[in-house]
A protein has these predicted regions:
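N-terminal Rossmann-like dinucleotide/flavin-binding domain of flavoprotein oxidoreductases
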Residues: 2, 41-42, 46-132, 211-237, ...
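Core beta-strand elements of the Rossmann-like FAD/NAD(P) dinucleotide-binding domain
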Residues: 2-4, 127-137, 250-259, 296-297
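Flexible, glycine-rich terminal cap/loop adjacent to redox cofactors
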Residues: 4-33, 38, 45, 49-56, ...
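Residue-level detector of alpha-helix initiation sites
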Residues: 8-15, 34-35, 146, 166, ...
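Glycine-rich dinucleotide-binding loop and its adjacent helix/turn
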Residues: 44, 142-197, 229, 276-296
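Rossmann-like dinucleotide-binding cores of NAD(P)H-dependent redox enzymes
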Residues: 89-92, 166, 172-176, 182-246, ...
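FAD-site-proximal beta/loop scaffold in flavoenzymes
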Residues: 155-172, 254-334
């Protein structure tokens, strides 16, 4: 039986752990899927490459408002897919080849789970092929998977998730998307911009309900002007007919589609690891970790979607850096360890309009007892907004009027994910609203002036 110093389950952010400090350690890497994990292969990176193609198409369609006549001759879906995965697939293949070539690393390419804890404290792991090995330390970075409602899963109809929709053989004429979160809205934007009719089926009354209410309501209105949104609806069943797929809704109606994308959330893969056999605690279907990313089992760490509620690649990368350092410390030596910092975790939704946010929503700030001040500034209020003829972009800032501290920032509009960065810095380093507004130059007439004006509105 092989014996290792370290076993890593998952090759998303977990694959970034090994640097020169681990060159003398024997390492087992366990990956049943494609090397690189969700973000590289079926998540953040390929979706944003599709989003960019969608934005090019939208720019052409809207060119007339700027005095330029243009039209789209054809959408070459095969070429779009080839452009994306012609870049992505070699990276995944190269990553696996690189690890396999390292003399201190063995790669196990079938599903791996915990088997038992040995008398000496080492962990026994077993693959679905029946191979067994032990490791002194284990890092669980097994990610998450798309969750499919039983009403669709049990009917046997063909459906897509974010794992495979980007490789659909051809563009459907009508795509029904089940779900109203960030994955659903990004794919609605992509396929709509490429000429596909979109219908969204959502259980609640609004899209992107995790956002601040102002942005969620505003985005839902914008989306409803472009896509059909069936709100307050559940799927009871589905079947196929000669025309495609039929979804049966709880109001008695049927919804005909050429293709169905299920985007109703993701579930941690923690339940597939037999973690309890190793004494690893779970809560709300995720592995429980402390601020050092330690699990309840000695010498076992976890990171990323398998243990984090954020489901964001930049969070997983941050946690990987923490684990990378803490693996080299004694298990109880917290003075030598570093802790994760999840105080101000930003996120973005790459739909149209783009959305970015960090910190508290207005409702959350009120619930926490802050003396809340809010300012909403429109893109149309600044010169760059005039240049782009923007009518939808807004910045909403939330502060504590007693201390001047920024509590939350919520942006909807062009390049929201880029222009929010100085606000993330302000919150992280404790700058007040007034210091942020007046302590630096703001380039005129650049788009970040909309942030400057919002800050000034709070500091007056």
């Amino acid at each position: 039986m092989e014996s290792y110093d370290l076993a890593i389950i998952g090759t998303g952010s977990g694959n970034s752990l090994l640097d020169d400090r681990y060159a003398r350690k024997r390492v087992a890497i366990c990956e049943q899927g494609t090397f690189g994990g969700t973000c590289l292969n079926v998540g953040c990176i390929p979706t944003k490459m599709f989003v960019y193609a969608a934005e090019v198409a939208e720019t052409i369609r809207s060119a007339a408002r700027y005095g330029i006549d243009a039209h789209i001759d054809r959408v070459r879906w095969d070429d779009i897919v080839s452009r994306v995965f012609g870049r992505i697939d070699p990276i995944a293949i190269g990553g696996e080849d690189y690890r396999r070539a390292q003399p201190n690393v063995d790669v196990y390419d079938t599903h791996t789970r915990f088997a038992a804890v040995q008398d000496d404290g080492r962990y026994l792991l077993r693959t679905d092929d029946g191979e067994e090995f032990t490791a002194e330390q284990v890092v669980i970075a097994a990610g998450a998977r798309a969750e499919v409602p039983p009403a669709i899963l049990d009917c046997g109809v063909r459906y897509y998730t974010s794992d495979d929709i980007m490789r659909i053989p051809q563009l459907p004429k009508h795509l029904v998307i089940v779900g109203g979160g960030f994955v659903a809205c990004e794919f609605a934007h992509i396929f709509s911009a490429l000429g596909v009719r979109i219908t969204m089926v959502i259980r609640g009354g609004a899209l992107l309900r995790h956002l601040d209410d102002t942005l969620s309501r505003r985005f839902t209105r914008i989306a409803a002007s472009k896509w059909e949104v069936r709100s307050h609806r559940n799927i009871l069943g589905s079947h196929e007919n000669r025309s495609g797929i039929v979804l049966e809704l709880d109001d008695g109606s049927d919804l005909q589609a050429d293709a169905v994308l299920v985007a109703t959330g993701r579930r941690s893969n923690a339940d597939r690891l037999d973690a309890d056999t190793a004494g690893i605690a779970m809560d709300d279907r995720r592995i429980v970790v402390d601020e050092y990313q330690r699990t309840s089992a000695r010498n076992v760490f976890a990171l990323g979607d398998v243990s984090s509620p954020y489901e964001l690649k930049h969070v997983a990368n941050h946690e990987a850096r923490v684990v990378q350092r803490n693996l080299l410390c004694g298990w109880d030596d917290t003075k030598a360890m570093v802790a994760t910092d999840h105080r101000y975790v930003p996120a973005a939704v790459f739909t149209d309009p783009q959305i970015a946010y960090v910190g508290l929503t207005e409702n959350e700030a009120v619930a926490k007892g802050f003396d809340v001040s809010c300012k909403i500034q429109h893109y149309a209020d600044v010169a760059y907004g005039w240049a782009t003829e923007d009518t939808v972009g807004i910045v909403k800032l939330i502060s504590d009027s007693k201390t001047g501290q920024l509590l939350g920032a919520h942006i909807m509009g062009h390049q929201a994910s880029s222009i929010i960065q100085p606000l993330i810095q302000a919150m992280t380093f404790g700058l007040t609203v007034h210091e942020m507004a007046r302590g630096q130059y703001w380039i005129h007439p650049a788009l970040p002036e909309v942030i400057e004006n919002a800050l000034l509105g709070l500091s007056d």
